[in-house]
Design a protein with these regions (language model features):
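Acidic, glycine-rich active-site loops and adjacent beta-strand->loop/helix elements
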Residues: 59-65, 89-93, 117-122, 163-165
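Flexible, glycine-rich active-site loops centered on histidine and acidic residues
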Residues: 108-140
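A glycine- and small-aliphatic-rich helix-loop capping segment at beta-alpha/alpha-beta transitions
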Residues: 69-80, 102-107, 130-135
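Active-site-proximal alpha-helical scaffold in enzymes
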Residues: 31-45, 88-116, 143-148
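Condensing-enzyme catalytic core mediating Claisen C-C bond formation in acyl metabolism
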Residues: 1, 40, 44, 129-172
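Active-site nucleophile and cofactor-binding loops and adjacent substrate-binding regions
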Residues: 27-32, 56, 84-94, 134-136
């Protein structure tokens, strides 16, 4: 960002310091809203409905609010029965969510698990820090983990193996 070729928009304070409008407790949170949009796409691509999902995991580096659990909010918005919970493992949250879902499917605790990774980073970024502000953004991804015998999609991936590892670093 130090070598800007086209400065259009970069001096706009609303882009440099975006703000999320507060929502009432009766409204879905912003994280829930983007998570639901991603979840619907993943479910459509997997050819499954809310009735086919046994569990919802929301795995994110930070949560918009502490409670209720974001996963339960997403579960309610999608009309999914079963259970839901949040996971927070910083940058590795999505990876750990996939591992947890895989373990649940392999053990027989769930037939299908929806993992959603909504990230809202703009709320706590310093957009004036030209060395790092461009790395982070707001996004949501989702995936359905299921066994091959339950798979309904022609475009599925196979999980061949998994292994998790964490290493402490304060170099953020």
């Amino acid at each position: 960002s130090r070598f800007v070729m086209n400065k259009a928009g970069i001096v706009d304070p609303m882009r440099m310091m975006p703000r999320l409008e507060p929502r009432s407790n009766e409204e879905p949170s912003v994280m829930c809203e983007i998570a639901v949009a991603a979840a619907k796409q993943a479910m459509e691509q997997a050819n499954v409905t809310a009735d086919d999902i046994d569990a919802v995991l929301v795995a994110a580096s930070n949560m918009e609010r502490a409670y209720p659990a974001m996963a339960i909010e997403v579960q309610a918005e999608l009309g999914i029965k079963g259970f839901a919970f949040d996971m927070n493992v910083a940058c590795s949250s999505a990876t750990f969510g996939i591992q947890q879902a895989y373990d649940m499917v392999v053990s027989g605790n769930a037939r299908r698990v929806l993992i959603v990774n909504p990230e809202i980073c703009t709320g706590h970024l310093n957009f004036r820090d030209r060395d790092s502000h461009f790395i982070f953004g707001d996004v949501a991804t989702a995936v359905v983990i299921e066994s091959a015998k339950h798979c309904r999609s022609d475009h599925a991936f196979e999980i061949l193996d998994t292994k998790l590892q964490t290493i402490y670093s304060n170099n953020i």
